[in-house]
Amino acid sequence: MPDGVGRELPRDGTVLAFDYGEKKIGVALGNFVTRHATALTILPNVSVEGRFQAVGELIREWTPVQLVVGMPVNPEGGEQPSMRLARRFGNQLNGRYSLPVEWVDERYSSRMAAMGGARRGELDAEAARIILQQYFDQLPL
């Protein structure tokens, strides 16, 4: 669920969403006008420097006003080890780029991506698209 309680959301602008994984990071793109998410790319996650160089290039290219990070909670809604990594990644995004970060429960996003017909090499970007679409769908009109 978005946690920007009390913060006014932009009426316009681009949003980038991330499905953080230890080996790959899926990225999706959308905007506040259409509230439609599109799978964008998959970034290799091999080093901190490489990760943030690639993210920085996307931020310069797309100039987002908001970032969204999937939060991998377990099926019961509780913490799991990968949550800490995703939270750290989102906090680093906020610190490096001074952009607001929202968290979205990403339970089953990868499974939904596979069931939706995404090819194996596109699963992470499609999972990011699902995360971003969930974010848009739960925003007030």
Swiss-Prot record:
InterPro entries: RNaseH-like_sf, YqgF, YqgF/RNaseH-like_dom, YqgF/RNaseH-like_dom_sf. GO terms for biological process: rRNA 5'-end processing. It is found in: Cytoplasm. CDD domains: YqgF. Keywords: Cytoplasm, Hydrolase, Nuclease, Ribosome biogenesis. Could be a nuclease involved in processing of the 5'-end of pre-16S rRNA. Belongs to the YqgF nuclease family. This is Putative pre-16S rRNA nuclease.
